[in-house]
Amino acid sequence: WEDFISELLVRKYHAVHLVAGHDFRFGHKNEGDVEKLRSYCAAHGLGCDIIPRVEKDGVTVSSTYIRSLLEAGEVRRAAEFLGHYFSVEGTVRHGEGIGKKALFPTANLIPEEHIIALKRGVYATRAHLPNGETCVGVTNVGVRPTVSDKNTVTIETYLVGFDGDLYGQKLQLDFFDYLREEKKFSSTQELHDMIAHNAEEAKGIVKL
């Protein structure tokens, strides 16, 4: 376990102060614990803070629990534990143009990095635009079964009331609530009507 600190954290990442949760385990076979971490730091002149257990509503706040909420689509509950809304940031890319032609214009996001596997479905979101303004968003995380036969998961957002070009620019989405599961509609008109309904729902949920 000492090599984990000396070789990885100190030598490779040049760490001078380490912060860990109360139940942190590390090293070969998880032999390292917070007491060993604290002792090592004291002996080698490194700063060290151990974060005590924190509970909310009788549940221990942990990254594992928060991930499970996000994977279940419970973004509102996750925000209570995070202290802020779960967000995704990325670059807007060109899509297939289907939304602009037959539905609503959408922003297709390439996330900055690998993100936690959010439950597929439609969310009420707040979009942070490049000019500093915010607007309500209806975000689909999924494969868009009504308009595409590809099985690639995308993050596609209808920015309510926005009319502009965001291609190649950064966009941040804050996830406020889960609206519905992704489904295949019988026609693009039916999908259009549902997106319009979801937009009205989102406007009543999202705080700008």
Language-model regions, residue ranges each:
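Phosphate/ribose-recognition catalytic cores of enzymes acting on nucleotide-derived substrates
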Residues: 94-208
